[in-house]
């Protein structure tokens, strides 16, 4: 049995983290505690979490039907497959916000989140090119059959850069499960938590959330590492044979 003062200190830190991360459950909070050097059994953290009344309230799904996600083949390296999609939101005055989300299916990194009032196929191609200049071009991009993604501009961009476009079947969002999962987190932890009054404000807030998502947020599919941490380890592992060859 842990002394009361230890439980009190752990609970206090747990409450503080939960207030900073309003949409995190106990598993992610436990990962943050571990990262800080506080090593506590996850069952103990769960008990203190419940006793402190910190359980995250589940938001109702907009669509009443539960859909089972299809199992997608997991890529084996960064830049093997990127997934792209749109998430819609609005400013306080009702004007539409369109967010282009780009995710690396292997590292789970949010490659970019582009925010504007309107985004055409040519705009999508330009933003992918901007991301690729920094990260390298992906081998393939998975997307739905929206008009921006089936446009001549994106098709020409993909052909020119040796990128395969993988179009999912119409009406089958589960075939794009990796980015559907990301979009759910983006809406729950960012869009639903903020009230945007201008496009500039939305861009600043969303860029900050994306950075935090990549660099700090523990990801369950990556053994609670952040995407950036996981990606850095992958790059280091991939670089080892190349270094040895030149010795």
Predicted regions and their residues:
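Charged DNA-binding/catalytic regions of mobile-element recombinases
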Residues: 1-247
């Amino acid at each position: 049995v842990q002394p009361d003062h230890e439980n009190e200190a752990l609970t206090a830190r747990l409450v503080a983290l939960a207030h900073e991360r309003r949409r995190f459950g106990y598993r992610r909070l436990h990962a943050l505690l571990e990262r800080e050097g506080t090593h506590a059994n996850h069952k103990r953290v769960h008990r203190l979490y419940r006793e402190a009344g910190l359980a995250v309230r589940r938001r109702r799904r907009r669509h009443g039907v539960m859909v089972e996600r299809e199992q997608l083949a997991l890529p084996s390296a960064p830049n093997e497959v990127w997934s792209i999609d749109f998430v819609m939101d609005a400013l306080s005055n009702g004007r539409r916000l369109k967010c282009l989300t780009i995710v690396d299916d292997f590292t789970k990194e949010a490659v970019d989140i582009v925010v504007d009032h309107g985004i055409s196929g040519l705009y999508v191609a330009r933003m992918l090119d901007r991301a690729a200049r920094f990260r390298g071009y992906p081998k393939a991009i998975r997307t739905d059959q929206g008009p921006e993604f089936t446009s001549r501009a994106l098709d020409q961009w993909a052909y020119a850069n040796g990128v395969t476009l993988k179009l999912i079947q119409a009406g089958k969002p589960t075939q794009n499960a990796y980015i559907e999962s990301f979009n759910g987190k983006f809406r729950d932890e960012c869009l639903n938590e903020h009230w945007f009054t201008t496009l500039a404000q939305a861009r600043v807030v969303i860029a900050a959330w994306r950075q935090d998502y990549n660099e700090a947020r523990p990801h369950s599919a990556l053994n609670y590492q952040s995407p950036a941490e996981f990606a850095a380890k992958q790059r280091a592992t991939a670089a080892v044979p190349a270094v040895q060859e030149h010795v």
